[in-house]
Amino acid sequence: MSSKSKALAVAAALTLAGGLSTVGTVAASAATPQCGNACVEVYSMKYATPASLGFVETVFLGIPVRGVPTIVQKASGSDPAEDLIVPLGGPVPVSQFYAEGMVSAAVDEHYGSEPAVQIEYAPYGKPTGLCTAVATTAYQDEGLSLQPCSAPGTTVWIIDVADSPATAPTYFPIVNGSDTDFVHPFAMTILGNPADQLFTPIIMQHLTGNPGSVPANQLWGAAHGTV
C-alpha cells in the first residue's frame, strides 16, 4: 500500500471509530439513547450524507437470530434494530484479525495494513454475539445476515480505502474478510432506492470501477451516537 493509501486508511479508520470529525453533526440518529456513542451507523453514500443519515444498515424486524438479514432502512433514533457496535471499540489492522485466525493468509497478504472491523448487533446497547456477515464465503449477490461473531472470515469487514482513494476517508468500499478475489473483491452493495421499496437488502457484489470510479451504491460511510 502506498503512503497516501496508508494515510487514507488511517483517516477512514478514525472516522469509523468516531475519532475524526469528518462526519460533523448529523441531522438524524440511528442509535437509541441506550446505545448512545457506542453505536455506529453504517450508511450508503448514494442515499445518505454525514449531515443527513437518511437510510442506514438495520437488522430486519430487529430479530436477534442467526440468519436474519440486514437491510437498509430509514434512520431512526428510537429503533433498536439499528443499534450496531464495533466490539473491539474501533478498527484494527487486518493483520490483527489474521493473528487471531479470523482471516486467511491471502487476505492478510493483500490487506494486512488496512483497517477492519466486526459489526455486532446490540439492541439498546446490549451485545447479542451476532455480527453482520455473510453465511458462507462471499459470492455474487449473497445477502448479508446475522451470524455468530466467532465465525472467521465472513464476519470481518475491511475498510478498503485503497480501492477508492478519491472518496476516502468519508466514503469507502467495505469488503468481506472471506474474499478470494483481490482485483474486484466482494463489497457491500445496495440495489434500488430504499425510499421506494419495503425491503432493501445489503448484498455482496464484485467491486466495480475501482480504484477511480467506484459507484455510489458500493461506497459507505459511518457516523456515531445520538444527537
Task: Label the predicted regions.
Residues 1-30:
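Secretory targeting and sorting signals
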Residues 31-227:
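Lectin-like carbohydrate-binding module/patch detector with strong preference for beta-trefoil
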